[in-house]
Regions:
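C-terminal transmembrane helix end/exit motif
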Residues: 1-20, 81-84, 162-165, 173, ...
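Membrane-interface helix-loop junctions in multi-pass transport and translocation proteins
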Residues: 1, 60, 126, 131, ...
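Alpha-helical transmembrane segments of polytopic membrane transporters and translocases
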Residues: 33, 48-49, 62-78, 110, ...
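Helix-loop junctions and terminal segments of transmembrane helices
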Residues: 67, 71-95, 162-168
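Interfacial segments at transmembrane-helix termini and the short loops linking adjacent helices
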Residues: 124-153
Length: 225
């Protein structure tokens, strides 16, 4: 199937050619901020897991991964929803910026409400969810999952403010800088917290990361008025 689709694509757009140095440089200048916006959260998460796997016991690591799987199942829903909304928002902004602003505000309320719904589901029904999805032996991860639940509404807010509004307003460079600052402080907070709090340090650092991202974005938007 892949070979057929590849051949079909080549028939439509023609054969592939390696880009020249000037073309590569131009593409990099145009897309580098989007690259950093995508890669920085991944680096932050991977560094967090590496640090934790070195310090905590394998048993604690297992509890962490159990709680993280439930958090990630809900957290990954934001991406597809945002991607579906982004083209319409971009199209509206090109012709009517004020309408795009109002649309973003409505989307922010919707995503925030969804975030608090996810938070309420996990926080108030932690043990039944763990028992159903992971098994009784993972009940020791209840506190970890409760803290992960607190991250969900914060992620919803930072997602709309950053990946929707700042990027629509062509503030990719500023957003990349904000994510870099938040990622560095998030990783540093793990080193500070992990000895005392173990696996709880990861969701706590995520709260710090998301809160700092939101505060920095709001500060930038206030200055840019």
């Amino acid at each position: 199937i892949c070979l057929y689709l590849f051949k079909y694509m080549v028939n439509i757009i023609g054969p592939f050619h390696l880009a020249g140095r000037s073309s590569i440089k131009a593409m990099w200048q145009k897309s580098k901020n989007s690259f950093f916006i995508t890669i920085l959260p991944v680096i932050y998460n991977n560094l967090s897991v590496i640090v934790m796997s070195i310090i905590v016991s394998p048993l604690q690591l297992g509890f962490y991964y159990g709680a993280a799987r439930i958090h990630r199942a809900l957290n990954t829903l934001y991406g597809p929803v945002g991607q579906a909304f982004y083209p319409r928002l971009a199209s509206t902004d090109s012709g009517n910026p004020e309408k795009a602003k109002q649309m973003t505000k409505k989307f922010l309320w919707i995503m925030t409400a969804a975030g608090f719904l996810f938070f309420s589901m996990i926080y108030f029904f932690t043990e039944p969810i763990i028992f159903l999805l992971l098994g009784e032996e993972f009940l020791f991860a209840s506190t970890t999952l409760k803290i992960f639940a607190m991250v969900l509404p914060l992620t919803a807010i930072s997602h709309v403010l950053g990946r929707q509004w700042l990027m629509i307003r062509r503030n990719d460079n500023q957003y990349a800088k904000i994510l870099l600052i938040s990622s560095i402080i998030g990783v540093v907070s793990i080193f500070i917290l992990i000895r005392s709090y173990g696996i709880l340090a990861i969701p706590i650092s995520l709260i710090i990361y998301e809160l700092l991202t939101i505060i920095l974005i709001l500060g930038f938007l206030k200055r840019a008025r």
